Each structure stands twice: as C-alpha cells, then as structure tokens.
Design a protein with these regions (language model features):
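N-terminal pre-Walker A segment at the start of P-loop NTPase domains
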Residues: 1-17
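Conserved lysine of the Walker
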Residues: 34
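Hydrophobic positions on the alpha1 helix immediately C-terminal to the Walker A/P-loop
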Residues: 37, 41
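Short glycine-rich substrate-engagement loop in P-loop NTPases that contacts/grips substrate
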Residues: 55-87
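Structural recognition of the conserved hydrophobic beta-strand(s) that form the central parallel beta-sheet
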Residues: 118-124, 145
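Interdomain motor-coupling "hinge/lid" segment immediately C-terminal to the ATP-binding subdomain
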Residues: 130-249, 280
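Accessory nucleic acid-recognition modules appended to NTPase machines
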Residues: 201-373, 378
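Conserved catalytic cores of phosphodiester-cleaving nucleases, focusing on short active-site segments
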Residues: 344, 348, 374-393, 412
C-alpha cells in the first residue's frame, strides 16, 4: 500500500538525528498508521529489523526465557534474523509489543546500555500491558501519540497544498474567496464521510471508490469489536460491546452510564468504558469549571461526553451509505448524531502535541432554568477560550455569551460551515480550520 505522509513523520525524523534519542513508544488505537510510519522512517537507515510479538513466537521466547543485557539480546536477534544491529545504522522496531511484557521492560535498558541504537516500539493495546508493569522507564522512554488522519493531513495527502496554504493564511480580516471556501467545504464533507483511518484514506486516494471505502470501514468495525475479547478477561466482550453501543447512541451528549436500552449496571458500563478509553477507541471530553489555568485543575470526572476516534467509522455505525450522502447537496445529511461536534473535538486533539495524551474539556452549568453548555474549552495564549460547534451556518450562542460574561473571557470561537468572520467578541472559524486554533 502506498504511504501517505503524516505530520508525525517530522517528529520521528527529528528524533532520528537528535544526539539523545530515547527508545520511542508509539501509542494509539489499532489501525491508525503506527507501523506504516515506522516503516517509512526505516528507509533512512542502512538496516531495519521489524519484530511482531503477536506473530513471532521465537522472538517472545528470546525475551521471556532470558535475562539478557541489550547487547546480548541484539546478538541473539542478529543470529535469529540475520539483520545487523549496529548503533547509528539500524532501526530496531518492536511491533505489537504488548504481547511480550519483558520486551516492554527491556526498553529502558536499551537507553542505558545502548544509547546510540534507534529503537521504536508500538502496540495497539499497549495501555493494558503498561498498566501491569510496576515501574516503567520514566525519562528513559519517549512516548508519541498517534491518531487517524487529521483534515490537514488529508488535504496534504490529496495534493491540495494550495488550498491548505490558503486556509492557513485566512482569518476574519481576510476570509477565503467563496469558491475556495466551497471547495474546502466539499472536501470537509468527503473527509467527515470516509474518516481518517489510513487504510480507508489510502483506498480513496488510489481508487476514488466510496463503495470499497465503505467495505474497509465495515471490516474495521468487525476487527475493532473482535478486539473487545482481548481487553480484559475479567470483563466479558459482550459487556464491552454494550458499553460501546451506548457510547454511539449518546455521542454529543453528557454520557449516562445507564440508559433505557442498557441491561448492565452503571458500574459495569463504567468499567467497560474505561477500557475503551484505554484502547484509544473512545475519547473523553471532561467537564471543567474553567475558572483558571490549567483547565484540568477543576474537573468533574463524573460529567463527561464521549467521542469515537473516527467519523468514518461512526457514519457506518449509523448505517449511512457514503456515496448517497456525498451526492446529497444538503450538508445536514452528514451532520446526524453530533458528528460536527465529534469532528471538531478530534481535530483539536490531533492538532495538539504528539508528546502527551491531550485532554479535551467542555463546560456545563446545570442551574435550574439556566442550563448552559459550551462544547469545548481550550487554552490559547494563556487565555481560556470557549468553542461552540454549529453543524450548519447559523445558530444561537446564549451559552457562549453566558460563559464569556461569567468567566470574563476576551474571546470566543464559533466553528461552523461559515467562512471566516467576527461578530463582536465571537470569532467565526470554519469547521475545516478548527485545528488551526491550537497552533
């Protein structure tokens, strides 16, 4: 499959040439492109050894049946795979490393004993394995977090470099030309339909076949559900599946652990949801009082909304046929089930630092006869900024104004299908450019 460049490629290249390069742990949900990014980086090395611990029993035995130093481990790996492991010239890649706990533990010793060897590890269910390791190499291992394609990555891979440049330069004083704006909206609609899972994006760019994209999405959904059995043996897969279905039903709303279609207790669903979050399949948006920075200092973890990691998967879970929606000129056909809010949240997440697991926040007031909610709250230039998401080209903003008055905010952002504009203290940012607000 052809490789389409990702923003994380530049971070991996910086790591490759830096004087100090701790072993990298690529973290993220299954099928988000971690292995492909490493293989792309490997083209810059003289030698490349990839070991998949889920598939390679011999590799697991090497790590599980010996207490070897990194040097001796490399000798055994060389004799077994006939690939020279030379510091500065070889990239050593441990894939699906969650299947071999001793291999995870070995990463810290590679940095201590062989600091010039480039080592990357990745795993789709890595968080579960790391939870069971009492001491993990703090300061000796660098984590990078990876997600599906962002809209920026999608445009770049599609060759829309000029459009991307225009979007980056545009602001409320210099909005996009209407023709350019409409083109961006069409591509936004396409991206929200197929989503950012690399296999789907690649298939679309190669064949432009939405039917095949739909088939790949359906296959990914089956694969993701099959993974539920691997999460934690003490929680049945059927219970995790029920929690997952409950999340899908409640996208865009404060999540209720008990709903009318649910047969499990709130406690059972809560435990299952936590596993879905650990697997990276579900993204939490947590309530914050937003009285000051950091936003995470005043959270209420009992109140949160939950997003799915990909809009394309969500569209298929709703049973929507991609080709029919793309041909429908009414953009509202794609905005069912809170997908605009989901897209905005995912773009904010993807535009954040690769080096930390970014938290998303929202604000809500439950006062009697004065309920208000702001979809997202971000920190921008040491200011607290509220963001409201509108699926169309208009919408009231009472909650935004209430928040700004109560918190004395200097600025708010409304993101919608509108072009760049400003009204009083409310800046209008098109949905396709919302990720730029993090930069």
């Amino acid at each position: 499959m052809k490789y389409f460049n990702r923003l994380i490629d530049k971070e991996l290249e910086k790591w490759m040439i830096s004087e100090i390069h701790q072993p990298v742990l690529l973290r993220g949900a299954r099928q988000t492109g971690k292995s492909s990014a490493v293989r792309n980086l490997a083209k810059k090395f003289d030698y490349f050894l990839e070991i998949n611990f889920e598939e390679d029993k011999e590799a697991r035995l090497i790590f599980e049946k010996s207490n070897l130093t990194p040097q001796l481990l490399c000798e055994k790996l060389y004799s077994n795979y006939d690939v020279p492991i030379i510091e500065g010239r070889t990239l050593l890649f441990f894939d699906e490393i969650q299947a071999c706990t001793p291999a995870i533990s070995s990463l810290r010793f590679f940095f201590e004993k062989m600091p010039d060897l480039h080592v990357i590890a990745a795993g789709s269910l890595l968080e579960f394995a790391m939870e069971e390791i009492p001491s993990f190499g703090v300061g000796r291992i660098r984590s990078l977090f990876m997600y599906p394609f962002s809209f920026t990555e999608f445009l770049e891979a599609n060759g829309n470099i000029g459009l991307l440049s225009e979007i980056r330069k545009a602001n409320f004083q210099a909005p996009l030309d209407i023709v350019v704006h409409n083109k961006a909206l069409y591509l936004l609609k396409l991206f929200m339909l197929i989503g950012g899972m690399p296999a789907v994006v690649a298939k679309y760019f190669i064949d432009k076949d939405l039917h095949q994209c739909q088939q790949i999405l359906d296959g990914l959904i089956v694969s993701l559900r099959d993974d539920f059995a691997k999460y934690k043996k003490r929680i049945p897969a059927v219970q995790i599946s029920a929690a997952f279905d409950s999340v899908i039903r409640q996208i865009g709303n404060k999540f209720l652990y008990v709903d009318k279609e649910q047969v499990y207790s709130a406690y059972q669903i809560k435990n299952a949801v936590e596993l879905l979050i650990m697997a990276g399949l579900i993204i939490p948006v947590t309530h914050t009082s937003a009285n000051g920075l950091p936003l995470g200092a005043e959270i209420n973890p009992k109140f949160r909304k939950l997003l799915l990691l990909d809009t394309g998967i969500f569209q298929r879970l709703l049973g929507l046929k991609l080709s029919d929606i793309l041909l429908n000129e009414n953009f509202d056909a794609i905005n069912k089930g809170g997908i605009a809010e989901m897209f905005a949240g995912l773009e904010l997440l993807k535009a954040s630092s690769f080096y930390q697991q970014t938290q998303l926040f929202y604000w809500q007031r439950e006062a009697k006869n004065a309920r208000a909610e702001v979809d997202f709250v971000i920190q921008k230039n040491m200011e607290i900024v509220p963001i409201e998401v509108k699926s169309g080209k208009q919408g009231k903003m009472q909650s935004m104004y209430l928040f700004m008055k109560e918190k004395k905010s200097k600025m708010g952002i409304r993101t919608s299908l509108e072009n760049f504009a400003v009204y009083d203290k409310i800046r209008i940012t098109p949905l396709y450019a919302i990720g730029n607000e993090i930069v």
